[in-house]
Curated annotation (Swiss-Prot):
It catalyses: ATP + H2O = ADP + phosphate + H(+). ATP binds at residues 63, 68, 85-93, 345, 370-374. This is Eukaryotic initiation factor 4A-III-B. It holds the Pfam family Helicase_C. GO terms for molecular function: ATP binding; ATP hydrolysis activity; mRNA binding; RNA helicase activity. A motif (Q motif) lies at residues 41-69. Residues 253-414 form the Helicase C-terminal domain.
Length: 414
């Protein structure tokens, strides 16, 4: 009706008017949660199967986070959902619980497909699914590049209820007919903004074309740029929107500071001075390039500091053993690129250092959102050269937050 009215006034075709209206809708989509979203305060009242509830409590969850209270029920109902949610809010468990609830374990075919931007995140999702589904006998495979194709095919032939993976490898497996899509009921796009940043748009569309027409779609993203809204328009039917306003995206309980360093070389001395503070719990130090990670790691070790490091060029096996070491607490300081900033969950991390300020402001939330997960307290310290001040102010404004100069007693705050 609205489209016809617009068409009448402007002398446009109805189809064109509809598109204009849709574009108008898109500009406002970011700022509201759909009215029909109610809040379910406990896992017990979500109507979940008994064996899944056991898995949830065994995993250590007690009370659902805000996004879980709103989204799980809607996804289980079969609605298409757009959730704007950053890391550290329990978004992975949100769709893992929902996916597990919707499976028919008796049928050994792929019923849910989860796409993620990085191998690490896909593996993390697989781990969470297997842990939460521990009492359900769920089969779940991570389908990611850089691993043996033959092994992938063997696993898929065996029968997997859920496949989590990166778009390239998943599409490859569908094309080879190893991943059969006929029983798929649900597609989850995790960190959709990052998948688009990495140039996966074509592959996501390719995968989508192979899925049954009635497939339910859930999309999770920290930001909702235009391209994402375009995608939701194509893939989704009357989606429910569950959105966190941008100024809530800076996780509460994280104290943010900056240290002014006049020159790049001074960052290293500053870091050495802070080392004792770093090892109080566990810390992650972010650099913007792989080369910088390698350089800083070597320099720290030369100065007799114990650190471990990780970036995207390392072989999968090596990255996994480094992560395992860090998770177990055997290593306390990890130097990394942004490959780590997405979806990897180490609860003990309570200090983040941005040795380099991130290249874009969205990454800032992914990095520091890690340090106070699920309401835990955390501290973030940004090393800022003179020409970085502008970027820092931009980040402050974007997240309507305050980043103060680091006090002398920073160790007491951790």
């Amino acid at each position: 009706m609205a489209a016809a009215a617009v068409a009448g006034v402007a002398g446009l075709t109805t189809a064109h008017a509809k598109r204009l209206l849709r574009e108008e809708d898109m500009t406002t989509v970011e700022f509201q949660t759909s009215e029909e979203v109610d809040v379910t305060p406990t896992f017990d009242t979500m109507g979940l199967r008994e064996d899944l509830l056991r898995g949830i409590y065994a995993y250590g969850f007690e009370k659902p986070s805000a996004i879980q209270q709103k989204a799980i029920k809607q996804i289980i109902k079969g609605r298409d959902v757009i959730a704007q949610s950053q890391s550290g809010t329990g978004k992975t468990a949100t769709f893992c619980v929902s996916v597990l609830q919707c499976l028919d374990i008796q049928i050994r075919e792929t019923q849910a497909l989860i796409l993620a931007p990085t191998k690490e995140l896909a593996r993390q999702i697989q781990k969470v699914l297997l842990a939460l589904g521990d009492y359900m006998n769920v089969q779940c495979h991570a389908c990611i590049g850089g691993t043996n194709v033959g092994e992938d095919i063997r696993k898929l032939d065996y029968g997997q209820h859920v496949v989590a993976g990166t778009p390239g490898r998943v599409f490859d497996m569908i094309r080879r007919r190893s991943l059969r899509t006929r029983a798929i009921k649900m597609l989850v796009l995790d960190e959709a903004d990052e998948m688009l940043n990495k140039g996966f748009k074509e592959q996501i569309y390719d995968v989508y074309r192979y899925l049954p027409p009635a497939t339910q779609v859930c999309l999770i993203s920290a930001t909702l740029p235009h391209e994402i809204l375009e995608m939701t328009n194509k893939f989704m039917t009357d989606p429910i929107r569950i959105l966190v306003k941008r100024d809530e995206l800076t996780l509460e309980g994280i104290k943010q500071f900056f240290v002014a360093v006049e020159r790049e070389e001074w960052k290293f001395d500053t870091l050495c001075d802070l080392y004792d503070t770093l090892t109080i719990t566990q810390a992650v130090i972010f650099c913007n390039t792989k080369r910088k990670v390698d350089w800083l790691t070597e320099k720290m070790r030369e100065a007799n500091f114990t650190v471990s490091s990780m970036h995207g060029d390392m072989p999968q096996k090596e990255r996994e053993s480094i992560m395992k070491e860090f998770r177990s607490g055997a290593s306390r300081v990890l130097i990394s690129t942004d490959v780590w900033a997405r979806g990897l969950d180490v609860p003990q991390v309570s200090l983040i250092i941005n040795y380099d300020l991130p290249n874009n402001r969205e990454l800032y939330i992914h990095r520091i959102g890690r340090s106070g997960r699920y309401g835990r307290k955390g501290v973030a310290i940004n090393f800022v050269k003179n020409d970085d001040i502008r970027i820092l102010r931009d980040i402050e404004q974007y997240y309507s937050t305050q980043i103060d100069e680091m006090p002398m007693n920073v160790a007491d705050l951790i």
